[in-house]
């Protein structure tokens, strides 16, 4: 995964995790999963509801929070290349 992808994904998922925001995760096959983000790494998201499910990121199409989320994002410095 590119560094830019991590700059967007990690703060978003971490905010959802820390604030215990309910999410709907849509998979590429159309299945909808719901719960709270328990943990995540480069390849998987642990989604907790009545049980904890390990969802591979390559199978995720969309992550929809139940409410608006403010993402702490620091833009990388602009280089004069």
Swiss-Prot record:
Source superkingdom: Bacteria
Subunit record text: Homohexamer.
GO MF, one example: RNA binding
InterPro entries: Hfq, LSM_dom_sf, Sm
Protein name per the record: RNA-binding protein Hfq
Tagged with keyword RNA-binding: yes
Known role: RNA chaperone that binds small regulatory RNA (sRNAs) and mRNAs to facilitate mRNA translational regulation in response to envelope stress, environmental stress and changes in metabolite concentrations. Also binds with high specificity to tRNAs.
Keywords: RNA-binding, Stress response
Provenance organism: Nitrosospira multiformis (strain ATCC 25196 / NCIMB 11849 / C 71)
Transmembrane annotation, as ranges: none
A cellular component annotation (GO) from this entry: cytosol
Gene Ontology process terms (BP): regulation of DNA-templated transcription; regulation of RNA stability; regulation of translation, ncRNA-mediated
Span of domain Sm: 10-69
Annotated family: Belongs to the Hfq family.
Keyword RNA-binding attributed: yes
